[in-house]
From Swiss-Prot:
MF (Gene Ontology): ATP binding; ATP hydrolysis activity; ATP-dependent protein folding chaperone; heat shock protein binding; protein folding chaperone
Lineage top rank: taxon: Eukaryota
Gene it is expressed from: Hsc70-2
Keywords: ATP-binding, Nucleotide-binding, Stress response
Annotated segments matching region Disordered: 610-633
GO biological process: chaperone cofactor-dependent protein refolding; protein refolding
A single cellular component GO annotation: plasma membrane
Residues in coiled coil: none
Protein name: Heat shock 70 kDa protein cognate 2
Family: Belongs to the heat shock protein 70 family.
UniProt keyword Aminoacyl-tRNA synthetase present: no
Pfam families associated with the record: HSP70
Record InterPro entries: ATPase_NBD (IPR043129), Heat_shock_70_CS (IPR018181), HSP70_C_sf (IPR029048), HSP70_peptide-bd_sf (IPR029047), Hsp_70_fam (IPR013126)
Length: 633
């Protein structure tokens, strides 16, 4: 078997998707439920950890211990305004640990705390496992996507999540850029085309303007967006609307009932999807709260009214990206829609009107385009695939200006917003007072004139500057922004040659190497536990299936084949084992196996009489038993 290829993962707020370049094309890989996207949900209960569809499916019964939206927490500080707003809506508990948000759940009877990176790493692990089943081997390398408007600490934290998941993250790439790759390859473009990617997903929003030359040079001209806007916010408006309606109709408030709110949210999500193709949607929820059934309807017009300010707010980044790219709307050849929320007719209408009635391009799958592009980039970086993709060149940009604080708290930019990456910029600075022997370099990102209004990335000192009048020392500060959009800063005193450097690892938001190592070993431990739980359930199912098959065989056996004593012997043994199973459903794998052996010891000789003469065909031969995958109803 050849080398296992690198994969592309779209790590989404609400759903994730994985793809791989194989046989000269991208394969989007379906999960074990047959779905090509997997919910970014992780659930913890008394016995196991669930990831993806199984986690989302049980959320109403276990709302407090089912975690989602990790992407809205990752790389942010606990006191971030957006996190404080979200806290009011999340059913799970988020606590403040040294300024960082941590998620607290109950798992196997114990309180556990997880960093957002750990939850994201569990989703990444699930996506890796989906790919491994398909590819038939261990996957090590991956390209992971992030919103174009993610800042330095959010990018670093996503990379850390990849490390905890045991992945070698080849590159962090921007979601709209990945979607543009998918579009460019799919359409086999000729000549130079200016493309605007409008990417509105479950939790984040990006706009990127690119020029694509001959379908091989992809150059991002500008990017804009909002890392906290998406389908979930539209769901929130619906949830609030119906919660108020319930209160009006039934004089009862459901806001303190986590299970009721979760069931209402699931119904609202479904209604929102229905309203993309119908003008009205119904909600029917039995015994929503205090035994009260809730039935209601909502029209598309009312849904649009509830969200109009959010819908309109998506147009401003479009205008800003065009302005930064120095392009007129008329210069855009294709407006390409990506992300599930672009299916909303009103958003399409607003965008179409903004472009003077221009036909929007709906030709790529909005749920899969980002993973598709990530898989292409993974193939490019590992040197596989045809010249069709090896000749592709991708030029991206920095989403935010980067600079240092100078006298008076002024932000002095070294890297301007929308500068091409990777890039290096340097500038000479000097001292502010006589005989100053050290300078503190404070690195910020953002667009405001004063550093207090921007985001502090990191601080370091350059010491040992020889005494001199103010303005004489020459301190060269160099910014090196790599292809992942992650920053290294170097400061050098030109008179002594002494230098200090820092990789912006944002101590306020980022995990230390030791923390990552600890989380990696914990992730391994959880995997062992998950595998053990899977084996335990399988051995329980095997025993259950064997009991059922023996009973069935005895009941169906023609008269005369077995004596009444033999029939009773099998039935009695099966009854006692079934009774033991009922009382010991949480027993260990070894116990189930031991009971199965005991059951086989008594039943197999009798079973072989029923199947006598059918040597080799019996599914009840010595030591064998039917393997039946059972599904809880």
């Amino acid at each position: 078997m050849g080398k296992i290829p690198a994969i592309g993962i779209d790590l989404g707020t609400t759903y994730s998707c994985v793809g791989v370049w194989q046989n000269s094309k991208v394969e989007i890989i379906a999960n074990d439920q047959g779905n090509r996207t997997t919910p970014s949900y992780v659930a913890f209960n008394e016995t196991e950890r669930l990831i993806g569809d199984p986690a989302k499916n049980q959320v109403a019964m276990n709302a407090k211990n089912t975690v989602f939206d990790a992407k809205r927490l990752i790389g942010r500080k606990f006191d971030d305004k957006k996190i404080q707003e979200d806290l009011k809506l999340w059913p799970f508990k988020v606590i403040n640990e040294k300024g960082k948000p941590k998620i607290e759940v109950e798992f196997k009877g114990e309180r556990k705390r997880f960093a957002p990176e750990e939850i994201s790493s569990m989703v990444l692990t699930k996506m890796r496992e989906i790919a491994e089943v398909y590819l038939g081997g261990k996957v090590k390398d991956a390209v992971v996507t992030v919103p174009a408007y993610f800042n330095d600490s959010q990018r670093q934290a996503t990379k850390d999540a990849g490390s905890i998941a045991g992945l070698n993250v080849l590159r962090i790439i921007n979601e709209p850029t990945a979607a543009a790759l998918a579009y460019g390859l799919d359409k086999n473009l000729k000549g130079e085309r200016n493309v605007l990617i409008f990417d509105l997903g479950g939790g984040t929003f990006d706009v990127s303007v690119l020029s694509i030359d001959e379908g091989s040079l992809f150059e991002v001209k500008a990017t804009a967006g909002d890392t906290h806007l998406g389908g979930e916010d539209f769901d929130n408006r619906l949830v609030n609307h119906f919660a108020e309606e319930f209160k009006r109709k039934h004089k009862s408030d459901i806001k303190g009932n986590a299970r009721a709110l979760r069931r209402l949210r699931t119904a609202c999500e479904r209604a929102k999807r229905t309203l993309s193709s119908s003008t009205e949607a119904s909600l029917e929820i039995d015994a929503l709260h205090e035994g009260i059934d809730f039935y209601s309807k909502i029209s598309r017009a009312r849904f649009e009214e509830l969200n109009m300010d959010l819908f309109r707010s998506t147009m401003q980044p479009v205008e800003r990206a065009l302005s930064d790219a120095k392009m007129d709307k008329k210069a855009i050849h294709d407006v390409v829609l990506v992300g599930g929320s672009t299916r909303i007719p009103k958003i399409q209408k607003l965008l179409q009107d903004l472009f003077g009635g221009k036909q929007l391009n709906l030709s790529i799958n909005p749920d899969e385009a980002v993973a598709y592009g990530a898989a292409v980039q993974a193939a490019i970086l590992t040197g596989v695939g045809s010249s069709q993709i090896q000749d592709l060149l991708l030029v991206d940009v920095a989403p935010l200006s980067l600079g240092i604080e100078t006298a008076g708290g002024v932000m002095t930019n070294l890297v301007e917003r929308n500068a091409r990456i990777p890039c290096k910029q340097q500038q000479i600075f000097t001292t502010y007072s006589d005989n100053q022997n050290a300078v503190t370099i404070q690195v910020y990102e953002g667009e405001r004139a004063m550093t207090k209004d921007n985001n502090l990335l990191g601080t370091f000192n350059l010491t040992g500057i020889p005494p001199a009048p103010r303005g004489v020392p020459q301190i060269e500060v160099a910014f090196d922004l790599n292809a992942d959009g992650i920053l290294n800063v170097n400061a050098k005193d030109n008179s002594t040659g002494k230098s200090e450097k820092i990789t912006i690892s944002n101590d306020k938001g980022r995990l230390s190497k030791a923390e990552i190592d600890r989380m990696l070993s914990e992730a391994e431990k959880y995997k062992v536990e998950d595998d053990r739980q899977r084996e335990r359930v399988q051995s329980k199912n095997n025993l259950e299936a064997y009991i059922y098959a023996c009973r069935q065989a005895v009941d169906d056996a023609p008269s005369g084949v077995l004596s009444e004593t033999e029939r009773s012997k099998v039935r009695d043994k099966c009854s006692s084992e079934a009774s033991w199973l009922d009382k010991n459903s949480l027993a260990e794998k070894e116990e189930f196996e031991s009971h199965l052996k005991e059951c086989q010891r008594i039943c197999t000789p009798i079973m072989s009489k029923i199947h006598g003469g059918k040597k080799g065909k019996s599914s009840m031969g010595k030591g064998s038993h039917p393997t039946v995958e059972e599904v809880d109803g």
